[in-house]
Amino acid sequence: MKESPLITLVKRHSETHFANIKYGYYVLIISLVYLIGLALLRAFGRRTPSRSSSAFKNKIIYRLYDIDPAIHLGILFFAVLVPFYYHYSLTTQSTVYLKRLGRLSYALIPLNLFLTLRPNWFLRKNCTYTDFIPFHKWFSRIITVIGLLHGIFFIIKWAIDDNVSLKQKLILKTFNFVGFIISILVLFLLICSIGPMRRYNYRLFYIVHNLVNVAFILLTPIHSRPGVKFPFLLLNCTLLFIHIINRIVFAKSLMILNKNANYSKTNLVHVRLPRAILPDYFEPGSHIRISPYRRINPLYWLLPSHPYTIASLAEDNSIDLIIKETSTAEPGSQIESLRSNPKSFHLDQEKNYTLINSYPPSVPEECYSQGTNIAIICGGSGISFALPLFRHFFNKENVKYLKMIWLIKNYSEYELVLDYLKTNGLTFEKKLSNNKRISVFISGEYTAETRLDEITTNIDDENSEYEMGSFNNEDEDLSISNFNSENADSNDNTPETSHSPTKENGSLIEVKSKHSFTLSNELKSFNNESAQVNQNETWLFSCGPPSLLQLSKKYCNDERINFSVRLTDYEGKRKE
């Protein structure tokens, strides 16, 4: 009898082929747990600096509440990396860990997409999307670096293995070649995201950022073995779809009603929009995002929109913006340069725009309802955030102390805001008291003819800081050092002045020129009042360049005072 030949069956996949599937699910579960923890933190967490705790403990508590990237990313990646090295040998089964890097990068994308939703209905009550901008910036970079390392390590592994053809592995195998293309795209994105490159041409970065993200989401399932179509591709595509729907459903056509500008003296301008573009109620300090393109235009989706803080209150008859326009002009040619400068964005009456949506400020709800001892300090275009807050608290009967400090470079900026108040019939005299006041500090000469030699940055887009957190803005040269008497612009014939130059609000607004500025001196009454009221009733708001925000944060940490800060380029001259 003839024996039948021996048939040997070879497994299509090695025993480690499916080793990372459970790890991908684990990362997804950690992402969900992080979101739940974040929602609980913002709903029940304490951001108030305790007067009985140490300054270090208060700082950690605030950074945790404020979604500081260093702390939150540290917690998140500690959780996802704890089981990263498990069971398999790093020397003999290194492929498992190289594949695990790739799955980790893709499994983290749903969390990143979810946190950047505008609006985010799950976290809307206690968070705004602006709270996540620093986190998103660093989280995105880490995800792309992990994905890039996955590709680089595989190329190195194949290159040093004499038993493997690099060409056959990398080029001839379709799914590996797709991965190689993804790596090239990710590398290009990382190059474009480097600070100098991003600031030089933010629009290029923004286009590359969006296109590479979409390519990464759609091409990775073709490359991945085993597949990631469910649940990761499904989740990512669903979240992308929600992003698209948000930019369609909430968008409205927009026309500029009026624009008040005097480029020969200042690049601070007042823009008026129709009241009907916003809902009946919006919080003081809210902002809008505007695109110069219609929704059917591909550039609406490819290029960034521009955020502007609303200087009005919900009860006003119009929506007003007080913004700084980027200028690279030489003296005497402001208008021409502003209009022709390709690296700037300006709102003009003769053009149509699209309002993408309105967004609440990153201000806790209890501040509006419980605040009775309020200080607001702002610089330059930060007045657009400070003024509606001042008006809101000014109209409240239970407010015991209210002071707004505005630091500017020349008197023309004050004139423009004064004109805005007059045009809208905004006077404060009927409810005026000794504990409610506005102080305006001018670093230059106190004269209506003073002309500011603007120090500007060649900015590609008014949006770059707001999107990615690079600190370049029109108010950055408004340094606190300019308000020290020895550093202020000096003129031997111009004495220090302190005036209340308006008839309507003369006893409310005090304008000071060439006075040295010390925050602790200006807020003595505020600090004294804070010791007599509940800690939740005392708040300091600050909006301006980084030097001003750092000064405000230090003051609040030292005095154990609640604070909310915002960078000026959020305000509108946005390159936020």
Curated annotation (Swiss-Prot):
The main location class comes to: membrane
Extent of Polar residues compositional bias: 480-505
Q: Which GO terms describe its molecular function?
A: ferric-chelate reductase activity
Give the UniProt entry's GO cellular component terms: plasma membrane
- Per UniProt, which keywords does this protein have? Electron transport, FAD, Flavoprotein, Ion transport, Membrane, NADP, Oxidoreductase, Transmembrane, Transmembrane helix, Transport
Q: Which domain of life is it from?
A: Eukaryota
Keyword set includes Cell cycle: no
Keyword Coiled coil in the entry? The reply is no
Q: Where's the Ferric oxidoreductase domain?
A: 101-219
Write out the ranges of the annotated region (Disordered): 480-507
Where is each FAD-binding FR-type domain found?
A: 250-388
Name where it's found: Membrane
What transmembrane ranges does the database entry give?
A: 21-41, 70-90, 101-118, 142-162, 177-197, 204-224, 230-250
Q: Partners and quaternary state?
A: Interacts with ribosomes.
Q: Which PANTHER family match?
A: METALLOREDUCTASE AIM14-RELATED (PTHR11972:SF198), NADPH OXIDASE (PTHR11972)
Protein name, per record:
Probable metalloreductase AIM14
Per the UniProt record, the source organism is Saccharomyces cerevisiae (strain Lalvin EC1118 / Prise de mousse) (Baker's yeast)
Question: What gene is this protein a product of?
Answer: AIM14
